[in-house]
């Protein structure tokens, strides 16, 4: 199937707040979508809705873990803060979370350390391999797989995903790797959202 190029008008109709960066991202997105067969308006609309939500309409390419509310931290990051593994937020856990407020690096190392190829909390891998790009590639193992697919050294240079070209390519690779175009073809929009964000955060926004 021939690639149907995305136009600036179409991109701004879906993501109106991306106007300041549209000149950088339009060619990058066209290259990425052509490479990974996001090649119909239905596929493109679904893809753009997802990356628009994940990246605040192409304006946020690196995850911020700067929080000021300890209870919110304990609620969001069960892996690092459900200390007694009971599935509830307890006062002791909220108190423990206070030590991670207003410190993105410390919090990332806590919640992402020791998982999916990351070294332990003290290694710094949690922050090094935090979510980046338009769809939030996270963890050493996913950086490695994505880098191998794209032919770029993402493990050694994870910050490459903060550049428009690789931010777009990594998102399109993730889409292709999870067979999300098939779901878009079938109109399974919630199924796509579940793959990208299992908690369903922002589902209504993605549908707009």
Language-model-detected regions and their locations in the chain:
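Peptidoglycan-targeting cell-wall enzymes and recognition modules
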Residues: 2-24, 52-173
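Solvent-exposed, polar/charged alpha-helical surfaces in well-ordered, non-transmembrane soluble domains
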Residues: 9, 27, 31, 45-48, ...
């Amino acid at each position: 199937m021939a690639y149907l190029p995305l136009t600036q008008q179409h991109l701004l109709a879906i993501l109106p707040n991306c106007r300041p960066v549209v000149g950088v991202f339009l060619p990058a997105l066209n290259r990425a979508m052509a490479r990974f067969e996001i090649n119909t308006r239905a596929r493109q609309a679904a893809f753009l809705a997802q990356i628009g939500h994940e990246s605040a309409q192409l304006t946020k390419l690196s995850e911020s873990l700067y929080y000021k509310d300890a209870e919110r931290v304990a609620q969001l990051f069960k892996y690092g803060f459900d200390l007694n593994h009971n599935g509830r937020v307890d006062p002791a856990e909220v108190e423990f979370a206070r030590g991670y407020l207003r410190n993105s690096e410390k919090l990332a190392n806590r919640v992402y350390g020791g998982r999916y190829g990351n070294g332990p909390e003290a290694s710094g891998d949690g922050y090094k391999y935090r979510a980046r790009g338009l769809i939030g590639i996270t963890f050493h193992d996913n950086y490695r797989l994505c880098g191998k697919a794209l032919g770029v050294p993402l493990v050694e240079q994870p910050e490459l995903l903060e550049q428009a070209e690789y931010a777009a390519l990594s998102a399109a690779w993730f889409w292709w790797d999870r067979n999300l175009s098939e779901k878009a073809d079938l109109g399974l929009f919630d199924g796509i959202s579940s793959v990208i964000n299992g908690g369903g955060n922002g589902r209504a926004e993605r549908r707009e």
